From Swiss-Prot:
GO terms for cellular component: cytosol; transcription elongation factor complex. The lineage of its organism: Bacteria, Pseudomonadati, Pseudomonadota, Gammaproteobacteria, Enterobacterales. This is Transcription antitermination protein NusB. It comes from Escherichia coli (strain K12). One of its GO terms (molecular function) is RNA binding. One of its GO terms (biological process) is regulation of DNA-templated transcription elongation. CDD domains: Terminator_NusB. Pfam families: NusB. The gene is nusB. Belongs to the NusB family.
Amino acid sequence: MKPAARRRARECAVQALYSWQLSQNDIADVEYQFLAEQDVKDVDVLYFRELLAGVATNTAYLDGLMKPYLSRLLEELGQVEKAVLRIALYELSKRSDVPYKVAINEAIELAKSFGAEDSHKFVNGVLDKAAPVIRPNKK
């Protein structure tokens, strides 16, 4: 798949995870509804599905990775920032094929696109601290 299709998968995953976090619906239902309602022809759908399932299954683990580096309580984070960080931390911890810098840069771009003003700076700050611990060899 093209890098653009992966980027689109991440963008869709942020939107679907945002919905999941707010609704507390089953992730499979969120996925089904998202795919039924959105145009996903330029999306790496397999990667989108993996991100959704991976984040949903590993939420407590991913939250534990970010908590030491948050400047506020996890509960005080915006839902978009939480979704973006969870995706990046999933990629850093579970997808060694995704380069270190790609995971961070994609998260920054997602935060710029979907997050509040300056949320990309917050996301970058958290990942700059967490990533070297998750991947000490920076690969």
